[in-house]
């Protein structure tokens, strides 16, 4: 199954071909069938781990590298794939970068445990390295093993920085509950400021209400960006 290719699901008869998905074989019913098929495969993997007697000491992670997309005929609006969050894949709004993350380790992590710790994919390498007690490594990531094991002593990022070169170029930076976006950089650039704690759907741009916070995050964003000739982002970089 390749999420960015045309969807292929198992034909389960009336379960998907009638009723709930507008009776459309493609793409909606097919998408639903593919998700169902994926769920079945995960169940088969879990069953095999239990059969081998290694389930309790096996880590299973379920996540995504970005928000929902429209590739392959996907229809994220129909399935309300993002819930309240704005944006999809390639957007730096929460809908494009906030994803589900399930960390299953039955022998050490209590079922139903929930955490609001903010982490990112570059935290995975140091996390796995700490789990296997590997040699010290120098990365931008921070191990989330303390959070996984229920330890309150968890280091946090000072900020998280994102950028994307398509769609006119965009940047985003999150520091604590504040998030600044720099959008359409290469054409008609604009900034948007949100408090993610009180406005997770990013509806109310409060940039005019908090000029000092805007300046703080803008300066931090400029420092975080690194020029890369392969991925020019700012207008001045296309001249180099």
Label each region the model flagged.
Residues 169-175, 179-184:
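Short, surface-exposed beta-strand/loop micro-motifs that present aromatic residues
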Residues 149-156:
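Basic phosphate/pyrophosphate-binding loop/patch that engages nucleotide-derived ligands
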Residues 165-167:
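Residues that act as N-cap/strand-start positions at coil-to-secondary-structure junctions
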Residues 1-125, 129-139, 182-189, 197-203, ...:
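Active-site-proximal cap/lid insertion segments
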Residues 158-162:
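WW-domain-binding short linear motifs
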Residues 143-146, 217:
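Short, well-structured alpha-helical segments that form the helix of a local strand-helix-strand
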């Amino acid at each position: 199954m390749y999420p960015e290719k045309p969807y292929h699901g198992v034909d389960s008869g009336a379960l998907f071909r009638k009723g709930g998905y507008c009776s459309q074989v493609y793409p909606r019913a097919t998408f639903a069938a593919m998700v169902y098929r994926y769920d079945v495969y995960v169940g088969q993997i879990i069953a095999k781990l239990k059969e081998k007697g290694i389930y309790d000491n096996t880590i299973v992670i379920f996540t995504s590298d970005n928000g929902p997309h429209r590739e392959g005929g996907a229809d994220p609006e129909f399935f309300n794939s993002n819930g309240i969050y704005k944006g999809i894949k390639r957007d730096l709004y929460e809908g494009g970068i906030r994803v589900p993350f399930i960390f299953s380790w039955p022998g050490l992590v209590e079922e139903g445990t929930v955490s609001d710790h903010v982490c990112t994919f570059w935290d995975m390498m140091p996390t796995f390295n700490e789990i296997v007690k590997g040699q010290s490594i120098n990365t931008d990531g921070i191990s989330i093993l303390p959070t996984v094991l229920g330890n309150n002593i968890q280091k946090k990022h000072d900020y998280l920085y994102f950028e994307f070169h398509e769609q006119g170029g965009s940047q985003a930076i999150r520091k604590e509950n504040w998030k600044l976006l720099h959008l359409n950089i290469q054409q008609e650039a604009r900034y948007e400021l949100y408090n993610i704690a009180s406005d997770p759907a990013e509806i109310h741009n409060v940039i005019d209400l908090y000029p000092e916070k805007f300046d703080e995050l803008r300066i931090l964003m400029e420092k975080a960006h690194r020029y890369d000739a392969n991925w020019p982002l700012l207008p001045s970089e296309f001249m180099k």
